[in-house]
From Swiss-Prot:
Ig-like V-type domain residues: 89-181
Residues found modified as Phosphoserine: S308, S314, S332, S375, S379, S407, S410, S436, S471, S473, S576, S588, S591
Annotated GO biological process: epithelial structure maintenance; establishment of blood-brain barrier; establishment of skin barrier; lipoprotein transport; liver development; protein localization to tricellular tight junction; regulation of lipid metabolic process; tricellular tight junction assembly
The name this protein goes by in its record: Lipolysis-stimulated lipoprotein receptor
Organism: Mus musculus (Mouse)
Record region (Disordered): 375-594
Tissues/organs with expression: Expressed in epithelial tissues (at protein level). Specifically expressed in liver and to a lower extent in kidney (at protein level). Also detected in brain, testis, ovaries, adrenal gland, intestine, muscle, and lung. In colon, only expressed in the lower portion of crypts. Expressed in the liver.
Biased segments, Basic and acidic residues type: 375-387, 435-444, 472-550
Length: 594
């Protein structure tokens, strides 16, 4: 248009109509040498929720459409924080920005500042159909769509800022080739709290909230208690049965009932108790105690060899169990029907087993099976002292008056002692002292090793092979009818080791006190005092007795066979045999009571 204008101005003298026609022709058909470009952003302000998609639109106009321009999107941070200013509108900075905007209507304090004081990054570049992302946005789902639209498929923290759209063309150098759009990314806040995904709770009344909290607390403590009982059944204090596992009780109910029955005397409903107290009206007399004895030599196996009472002195047949299942049935006590392999029940099993055998001294129900039952805690059928690992220290033997005056090897007899030096009268005053009750039995056999010497050949007695069998009970300790019990056949060195009971506490002594046969014998020697025997028994130690027992047992096991039964004697009358049988039977019953 510049040449046309100069041509119209350079013809002042021509016809005016011709001049106007030429000017219009030049204006219409003569183009300019360069055209301008225009870039615009329809929506310069965007607010989007985090992780939501957004598109920043950008359009441009240019005169040359033969070549495609280069579209560049740049990111520049805000000069001031819009979110902070929105929450504090009365701040000094906000008031200053308001004054600047009022004085300059086109001024924007959040966008207009130098690039050196803010962050500048290239987001994406497009030339033709090729889109290239900047280094900071590699891997993000960002692209340029249409002519120059920037699209975010998912926004992120830090995307808030100012995005500039620039269009560069080599042929269109004039015009406005840049425009910007503001983007603010906010976090999502819901109007009502979400308890569950997709579920929104509306306004809740105060009283309803309190009820819900109380019910939740009660349910929590209930579940906690049930779980505690299931994990620790031996320490729980709640006697309830869990519905999740009814076969396994969460408390030792059977053990609790059994212990209560054992202490209060009420019979248990789980198992018959042998330790509960009986009512006074139904209390039976105490049954005779069983004394397991050692079998005599050469007799059947109805005797228990491993059981002993009082140093193997009394021997009586054992009352054996008729049914083996009875013993196990009684010993089982209070049984909890549970798996013994379960770790949580092992302690319970041990406790109820100990409770079942808690106090064997209490009498049980008056039946033969329970009376014959033995406790697993303490029993007369335990191993004897020879098999125990620990032994009591032996006490020093105490000598008597006779021991101090005479040597143990002295052959002096009791008839040679003056009467004033002998003890005062009492039962068995004419008998020498022995080391044990078994030694008293050996005194009756002059040929035995316990007597210390053999009987004289003039006495006409039988030797060891023809001696009667040794008695292991206290029934045959002394027989006044036997001539072997005369004082001249005893050795005085056994006087120091006599072991017996107090004649006043022994029921057999009371029985003998009424026996006219013993009265005649005691009258012959009234100088013996039975209290001296009791005093000697209290002073004797266990070591000497055990040594004598062990030596005697080793000697018998090594080279001696059981003696033969005594031969039949024509001199023994029928009355004498019957009298001895009655006496042995009565004393055997007394030994059972003892």
């Amino acid at each position: 248009m510049a040449p046309a204008a100069s041509a119209c101005a350079g013809a002042p003298g021509s016809h005016p109509a011709t001049t106007i026609f030429v000017c219009l022709f030049l204006i219409i058909y003569c183009p300019d040498r360069a055209s301008a470009i225009q870039v615009t952003v329809p929506d310069p302000y965007h607010v989007v929720i985090l992780f939501q998609p957004v598109t920043l639109h950008c359009t441009y106009q240019m005169s040359n459409t033969l070549t495609a321009p280069i579209v560049i999107w740049k990111y520049k941070s805000f000069c001031r924080d819009r979110v902070a200013d929105a929450f504090s509108p009365a701040s000094v900075d906000n008031q200053l920005n308001a004054q600047l905007a009022a004085g300059n209507p086109g001024y924007n304090p959040y966008v207009e500042c130098q690039d050196s004081v803010r962050t500048v990054r290239v987001v994406a570049t497009k030339q033709g159909n090729a889109v290239t992302l900047g280094d900071y946005y590699q891997g993000r789902r960002i692209t340029i769509t249409g002519n120059a639209d920037l699209t975010f498929e998912q926004t992120a923290w830090g995307d808030s800022g100012v995005y500039y759209c620039s269009v560069v063309s080599a042929q269109d150098l004039d015009g406005n080739n840049e425009a910007y759009a503001e983007l603010i990314v906010l976090g999502r806040t819901s109007e009502a709290p979400e308890l569950l995904p997709g579920f929104r709770a509306g306004p809740l009344e105060d009283w309803l909230f309190v009820v819900v909290v109380c019910l939740a607390s009660l349910l929590f403590f209930l579940l906690l208690g049930i779980c505690w009982c299931q994990c620790c059944p031996h320490t729980c204090c709640c006697y309830v049965r869990c519905p999740c596992c009814p076969d396994k009780c969460c408390c030792p109910e059977a053990l609790y009932a059994a212990g209560k029955a054992a202490t209060s005397g009420v019979p248990s409903i789980y198992a018959p108790s042998i330790y509960t107290h009986l009512s006074p009206a139904k209390t039976p007399p105490p049954p005779p105690a069983m004394i397991p004895m050692r079998p005599p030599y050469g007799y059947p196996g109805d005797f228990d060899r491993t059981s002993s009472v009082g140093g193997h002195s009394s021997q009586v047949p054992l009352l054996r169990e008729v049914d083996g299942s009875v013993s196990s049935e009684v010993r089982s006590g209070y049984r909890i029907q549970a798996n013994q392999q379960d770790d949580s029940m092992r302690v319970l099993y041990y406790m109820e087993k100990e409770l079942a055998n808690f106090d064997p001294s209490r009498p049980g129900p008056p039946n033969g099976r329970v009376e014959r039952a033995m406790s697993e805690v303490t029993s007369l059928h335990e191993d004897d002292w020879r098999s125990r690992p620990s032994r009591a220290p032996a006490l020093t033997p105490i000598r008597d008056e006779e021991w101090n005056r005479h040597s143990p090897r002295s052959p002096r007899t009791w008839e040679q002692e003056p009467l004033q030096e002998q003890p005062r009268g009492g039962w068995g005053s004419g008998r020498p002292r022995a080391r044990s009750v078994d030694a008293l039995d050996d005194i009756n056999r002059p040929g035995s090793t316990e007597s210390g010497r053999s009987s004289p050949p003039s006495s006409g007695r039988r030797g060891r092979a023809y001696a009667p069998p040794r008695s292991r009970s206290r029934d045959d300790l002394y027989d006044p009818d036997d001539p072997r019990d005369l004082p001249h056949s005893r050795d005085p060195h056994y006087y120091d080791d006599l072991r017996s009971r107090d004649p006043r506490a022994d029921p057999r002594s009371r029985q003998r006190s009424h026996d006219p046969r013993d009265a005649g014998f005691r009258s012959r020697d009234p100088q013996y005092d039975g209290r001296l025997l009791e005093e000697a028994l209290k002073k004797k130690g266990a070591g000497e007795r055990r040594r004598v027992y062990r030596e005697e047992e080793e000697e018998e096991e090594e080279g001696h066979y059981p003696p033969a039964p005594p031969p039949y004697s024509e001199t023994d009358s029928q009355a004498s045999r019957e009298r001895r049988m009655k006496k042995n039977l009565a004393l055997s019953r007394e030994s059972l009571v003892v």
